[in-house]
């Protein structure tokens, strides 16, 4: 059996403001910084150590990982950053307040954009100032790969391809791996690992800054999973 740890970034500044974030590169809030520290403390106290780490190219996930590893005295381990672990791209919704958007388009439509597997939000245009394909951190993305909007299915395709090509071989080789990413990229990986249906994934939520531990067999099939609960600082099994 091997263990895999997934952690959604700590609370971000736009989580506080209730905005659609997507690929917008906002930082952690003060609470998010504390969540990342607590995650590191809990993981270390629970006996976890890591050989390798993966994260996105968005600072809220990278900073969460750095702080977590610092608390564990593991800042020296290899860290691989990839856009394929970025949050789902929310297209033209990025930056908009979720409540205001619901008032404009209706709760049902916004819920479809947020929770369904195959309904994309309105797309960005390439002349929009929020379109960041020219940023150096995206120099490895081909023009046709850079999203203007995504649904969860799109997100799952890129996350699972990176999992299969880069992460899974290391997990299978016995490496202790931590992935610091985002709500929807973790949902996408959880959907893949647990073979969750398109309908059931709509009800899956990933809390900020709380380590999610997967126990996997030699074929990387889940045996079980649980959260490390920051409130009681002990292992507590919870439904994902």
UniProtKB/Swiss-Prot annotation:
InterPro entries: His_Pase_superF_clade-1, His_PPase_superfam, PG/BPGM_mutase_AS, Phosphogly_mut1
Name of the protein this chain belongs to: 2,3-bisphosphoglycerate-dependent phosphoglycerate mutase 2
Protein task: Catalyzes the interconversion of 2-phosphoglycerate and 3-phosphoglycerate.
Site note Transition state stabilizer, residues: 182
Entry annotated with the keyword Ribosomal protein: no
Enzymatic reactions: (2R)-2-phosphoglycerate = (2R)-3-phosphoglycerate
Binding-site positions, substrate: 8-15, 21-22, 60, 87-90, 98, 114-115, 183-184
Documented EC number(s): 5.4.2.11
An individual GO BP term: glycolytic process
Annotated active site: 9 (tele-phosphohistidine intermediate), 87 (proton donor/acceptor)
Source organism, top-level taxon: Bacteria
Gene source species: Bacillus cereus (strain ATCC 10987 / NRS 248)
Gene name, Swiss-Prot/TrEMBL: gpmA2
Disulphide connectivity of cysteines: none
Annotated family: Belongs to the phosphoglycerate mutase family. BPG-dependent PGAM subfamily.
GO molecular-function terms, A-Z: phosphoglycerate mutase activity
Coiled coil residues, start to end: none
Pathway of action: Carbohydrate degradation; glycolysis; pyruvate from D-glyceraldehyde 3-phosphate: step 3/5
């Amino acid at each position: 059996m091997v263990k895999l740890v997934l952690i959604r970034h700590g609370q971000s500044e736009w989580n506080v403001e209730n905005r659609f974030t997507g690929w917008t590169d906002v930082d952690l809030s003060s609470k998010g910084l504390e969540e990342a520290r607590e995650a590191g403390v809990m993981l270390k106290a629970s006996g976890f150590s890591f050989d390798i780490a993966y994260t996105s190219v968005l600072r809220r996930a990278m900073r969460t990982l750095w702080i977590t590893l610092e608390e564990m005295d593991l800042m020296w381990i290899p860290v691989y950053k990839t856009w394929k672990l970025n949050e789902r791209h929310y297209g033209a919704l990025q930056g908009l307040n979720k409540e205001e958007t619901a008032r404009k388009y209706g709760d049902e439509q916004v819920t479809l954009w947020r929770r369904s597997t195959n309904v994309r939000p309105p797309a960005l245009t390439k002349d929009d100032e929020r379109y960041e394909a020219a940023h150096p951190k995206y120099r490895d993305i081909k023009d046709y790969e850079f999203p203007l909007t995504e649904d969860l299915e799109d997100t799952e395709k890129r996350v699972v391809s990176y999992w299969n090509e880069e992460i899974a071989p290391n997990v299978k080789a016995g490496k202790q791996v931590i992935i610091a990413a985002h709500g929807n990229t973790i949902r996408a990986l959880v959907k893949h690992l647990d073979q969750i249906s398109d309908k059931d994934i709509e009800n899956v939520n990933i809390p900020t800054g709380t380590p999610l531990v997967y126990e996997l067999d030699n074929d990387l099939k889940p045996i079980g999973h649980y959260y490390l609960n920051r409130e009681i600082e002990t292992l507590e099994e919870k439904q994902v």
